[in-house]
């Protein structure tokens, strides 16, 4: 990637971030349309028990996240040797087709399967795209390179998710998913034109990539991120019902809430990337402290519109700032298994996402109320901080060798 002009680098980074925008939209749009999905795909259950139907519709979020968990390490480990640009293009083809299938399949079970398949390329895309972005930015700016790619995901929550949610409310959720598929098709063109050719790791082998999992620090970083995002998704997955049933606003206010949380995620991601370039572990500890405070604020004030919006902004910011810090930590501790570790981070985050969405649904289905997932988020912060402390203690005893 040497010799690229600054405008070409910016175009390449934009193309990579556009893919993140599409991924953020396809992953998060279900949150704002979860009642629409429940009513259309589970009409009998929705008519008899709306709480149970909404909780079951949450499985669509869980299925996507589990697809990420399965696909990220598998694709990354098997494809580390292939040229990175070509691999990104194939992953975008998979995203486009699976999202179209999500829009067109007729039953809940088939849509559930399509969401699982749509999640398969997620972690591999982000893992490879962040490595490409880090190489384009150069030494000393890795965290910012990672944050630029992830900014596509967070900006999706400011623009893409609210607009697609509004489209889904007006034209139907199936039209919404077709619109998401068009974003992936556009990204394919952008990556093909703007991203420079970059060799894969020709020395990579499956056994070498898997050696990353023999490092305790890799596991600690993965679990720290998973637990942090698990707490976030316990709350975020059910933000739509909170808006309508706790705050007492109409469906039209859901996109507003999504914009606010997206702004928080965007600012948090960029701030977290810069902070990680100075102190990775310090950033992780600060993120957890802010996350606890913001969740407590959400639980106490979400019944008012100002309290809801301020709390969602803070929750999104704290959770999103954690992601580039964890990704940078993995670059430090993964040795020569960079591709797999980068992708495995997104698998771990989505394992946390699926766990958070599931546990949040359990508390709602149990009749504990739509704010009960906040307790799940707070409880998950305890092991998250504990794992980060263990990582620092081990590092002080045995300095990192990468």
Where on the chain are the PLM-derived regions?
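C-terminal membrane-cytosol helix-exit motif in multi-pass small-molecule transporters
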Residues: 181-201, 387-392
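Extracellular/periplasmic helix-loop-helix junction of adjacent transmembrane segments
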Residues: 34-70, 252, 256
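Helix-breaking motifs and short loop linkers at transmembrane-helix boundaries and internal kinks
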Residues: 83, 104-109, 248, 301-303
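Cytoplasmic helix-loop-helix junction between adjacent transmembrane helices
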Residues: 108, 114-152
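Conserved MFS/SLC helix-loop-helix module at the cytosolic interface between two early adjacent transmembrane helices
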Residues: 69-106
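Paired small-residue
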Residues: 94, 98-101, 109-118, 306-314
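C-terminal transmembrane helical hairpin of 12-TM major facilitator-type secondary transporters
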Residues: 282-326
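Helix-to-loop junctions at the C-terminal end of transmembrane segments
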Residues: 70-83, 268-280, 364
């Amino acid at each position: 990637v040497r010799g690229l002009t600054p405008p070409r680098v910016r175009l390449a980074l934009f193309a990579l971030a556009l893919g993140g925008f599409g991924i953020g939209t396809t992953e998060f749009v279900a949150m704002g349309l979860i009642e629409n999905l429940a009513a259309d795909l589970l009409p009998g259950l929705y008519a008899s028990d709306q709480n149970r139907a909404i909780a079951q519709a949450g499985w669509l979020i869980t299925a996507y996240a589990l697809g990420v968990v399965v696909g990220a390490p598998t694709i990354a480990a098997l494809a580390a040797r292939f040229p990175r640009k070509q691999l990104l293009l194939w992953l975008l083809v998979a995203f486009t087709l699976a999202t179209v299938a999500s829009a067109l399949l007729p039953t809940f079970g088939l849509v559930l399967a399509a969401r699982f398949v749509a999640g398969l390329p997620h972690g591999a895309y982000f893992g490879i795209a962040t490595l490409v972005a880090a190489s384009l930015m150069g030494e000393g700016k890795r965290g910012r390179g990672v944050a630029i790619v992830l900014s596509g995901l967070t900006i999706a929550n400011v623009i893409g998710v609210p607009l697609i949610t509004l489209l889904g409310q007006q034209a139907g959720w199936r039209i919404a998913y077709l619109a998401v598929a068009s974003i992936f098709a556009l990204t394919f063109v952008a990556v093909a034109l703007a991203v420079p050719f970059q060799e894969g790791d020709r020395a990579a082998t499956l056994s070498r990539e898997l050696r990353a999992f023999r490092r305790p620090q890799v596991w600690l970083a993965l679990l720290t991120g998973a637990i942090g995002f698990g707490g976030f998704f316990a709350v975020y997955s059910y933000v739509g019902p909170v808006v309508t049933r706790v705050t007492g606003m109409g469906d039209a206010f859901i996109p507003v809430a999504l914009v606010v949380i997206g702004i928080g995620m965007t600012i948090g991601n960029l701030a977290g990337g810069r902070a990680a370039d100075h102190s990775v572990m310090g950033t992780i500890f600060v993120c957890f402290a802010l996350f606890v405070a913001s969740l407590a604020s959400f639980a106490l004030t979400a019944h008012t519109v100002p309290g809801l919006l301020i709390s969602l902004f803070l929750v999104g910011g704290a959770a999103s700032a954690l992601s580039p810090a964890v990704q940078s930590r993995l670059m430090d501790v993964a040795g020569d298994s960079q591709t797999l570790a980068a992708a495995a981070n997104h698998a771990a985050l989505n394992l946390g996402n699926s766990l958070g969405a599931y546990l949040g649904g359990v508390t709602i289905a149990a009749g504990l109320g739509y704010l009960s997932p906040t307790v799940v988020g707070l409880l998950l912060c305890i092991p998250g901080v504990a794992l980060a402390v263990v990582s620092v203690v081990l590092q002080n005893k045995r300095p990192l060798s990468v």
